């Protein structure tokens, strides 16, 4: 880089030498003896063409969207809605606020935390899980211990002054009998299926003991009134037999309807083939 003392100075025409002269830096804009601008155009025009060619690769790209909020944000004031997560939003969303989010990806990357801060959260109160009345009574009966921490059978339990729903008032030392087990499934009355087909020339009869569904299957109750696997298998087998009987009944009705349709078609063909008498009204064409 040339020094300031080596820079030649020249005065502008029409001015005195006492005026401040302009310092003209004449540097050789060349690189290894070759000019910097290869073409014969001006440097400014070449710079414009270089900028336009560089920006042509970014055609179609949009800058990242910036959310716009046209209200004054007061982060210290509580929200009007009272929601726990409103204080973390960029602004209050009311009727006068115009909040625009052009790019939905902004909401994904700036999701506000749910609820208040962890220091402001109160301990969650969880209610104690309540058992069924039957299991609760058994738990209270077996809570009394006998000997060195051994559980007492539910049939004979030493308890205090209690009044069960199935017994009288007891005193300490009396034996509490086991609670009676009630059947869990009430008997359901099902309507019996008809044993014949109406409006058919063929009378179809089925056995009453096959179509009768009024009887309920036998159930073997366990300790808590549950059905054993054998009884459940027996119930499924009986239900399958009932479905088979219903299918047989529907198949018989279908055959009866087919025969009835054939009978009506034959009657209609005979009526069309008979010559019409002059006294009778004319029949429509078949």
From Swiss-Prot:
GO biological process: bidirectional double-stranded viral DNA replication; protein sumoylation; symbiont-mediated perturbation of host cell cycle G1/S transition checkpoint
InterPro entries: KSHV_K8 (IPR010805)
Annotated phenotype, changing residue 75 to A: Complete loss of SUMO E3 ligase activity
GO molecular function terms noted in the UniProt entry: transferase activity
Top-level taxon: Viruses
Secretion signal span: none
Keywords: G1/S host cell cycle checkpoint dysregulation by virus, Host-virus interaction, Modulation of host cell cycle by virus, Transferase, Ubl conjugation, Ubl conjugation pathway
Pathway stated in the Swiss-Prot or TrEMBL entry: Protein modification; protein sumoylation
Region called Disordered, residue ranges: 1-22, 106-130
Top-level class of the enzyme under EC nomenclature: transferase
Protein modification: Sumoylated.
EC number: 2.3.2.-
Function recorded in the entry: SUMO E3 ligase that plays a role in viral gene regulation and is essential for viral reactivation. Disrupts host G1 cell cycle control thus allowing viral transcription and translation to proceed at the early stages of infection. Catalyzes its own SUMO modification as well as that of its interacting partners such as host TP53 and RB1. Regulates viral gene expression and reactivation and may mediate the SUMOylation of viral promoters in the low methylated 'Lys-9' histone H3 (H3K9me) region which results in a diminution of viral gene expression after reactivation.
Assembly with partners or alone: Interacts with host HDAC1 and HDAC2, these interactions suppress HDAC activities. Interacts with protein ORF57. Interacts with protein vPK.
Protein name: E3 SUMO-protein ligase K-bZIP
Organism the protein comes from: Human herpesvirus 8 type P (isolate GK18)
């Amino acid at each position: 880089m040339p020094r300031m003392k080596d820079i030649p100075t020249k005065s502008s025409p029409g001015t005195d030498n006492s005026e401040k002269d302009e310092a003209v830096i004449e540097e050789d804009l060349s690189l290894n003896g070759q000019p910097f601008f290869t073409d014969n155009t001006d440097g400014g025009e070449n710079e414009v063409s270089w900028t336009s060619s560089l920006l042509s690769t970014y055609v179609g790209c949009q800058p990242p969207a910036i959310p716009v909020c046209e209200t004054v944000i007061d982060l210290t004031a509580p929200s009007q809605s009272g929601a726990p997560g409103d204080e973390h939003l960029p602004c209050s969303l009311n009727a006068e606020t115009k909040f625009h989010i052009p790019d939905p990806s902004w909401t994904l990357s700036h999701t506000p935390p749910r609820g208040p801060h962890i220091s402001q959260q109160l301990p969650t109160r969880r209610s104690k899980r309540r058992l069924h009345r039957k299991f609760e009574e058994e738990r209270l009966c077996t809570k009394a211990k006998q000997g060195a921490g051994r559980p007492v059978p539910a049939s004979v339990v030493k308890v205090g002054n209690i009044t069960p729903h199935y017994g009288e008032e007891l005193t300490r030392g009396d034996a509490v009998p086991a609670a009676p087990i009630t059947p869990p499934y009430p008997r359901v009355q099902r309507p019996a299926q008809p044993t014949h087909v109406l409006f058919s020339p063929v009378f179809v009869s089925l056995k009453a003991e096959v179509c009768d569904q009024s009887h309920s299957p036998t159930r073997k109750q366990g300790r808590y009134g549950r059905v054993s696997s054998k009884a459940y298998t027996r119930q499924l087998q009986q239900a399958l037999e009932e479905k088979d009987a219903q299918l047989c009944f529907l198949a018989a009705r279908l055959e009866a309807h087919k025969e009835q349709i054939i009978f009506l078609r034959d009657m209609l063909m005979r009526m069309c083939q008979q010559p019409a008498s002059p006294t009778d009204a004319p029949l429509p064409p078949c």
